[in-house]
């Protein structure tokens, strides 16, 4: 298994009323090879409300481990990697209900060796909430564009036992241009020239910009890692 681990923290409107913690473990078979079981998380990982991803070295498998306990962070993903240490942004910390929660959140991060903090959040957001000002189709276009550029492979949708959350998994290759402006132009060109997007672009002129906004953290994430492949996730809230 790769040493890359991606924690994706989710926040949903309703939590179980029982005292039992809800936990599911599964493995996603990407290319039909033998599945690789996901190792159990380390100490205090159950303090997080999130999902742990681990990929094999050749990126043929992605392991998914979903833990739900309490919503420490809202609309935020954290990355934990031997060479990268992330922290919540001040604005996201301010969203927590109390200073006690903020202190607890930082203590949990420190317990996972996240000592060197950097202001970086890989935030793809919730489909339902972004849909208030972002066309839902933008998510599908994002995956399609990455595939056309040869930068990633969509694994389709994976539904957690939590009925409120869907996930769209993506294996992203590190073969991305060094200059983001050039990369953005390639994406914009695909959106502008493909007839399939013509009607959608005419209805939503800002669609290109909205898609590019989702690509920025993906690009930054790639260039902060030495890994050849990066497991990505887009959290989507189920439409009511």
List where the protein language model places each region.
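ER/Golgi luminal nucleotide-sugar-dependent glycosyltransferases, focusing on the catalytic module
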Residues: 1-240
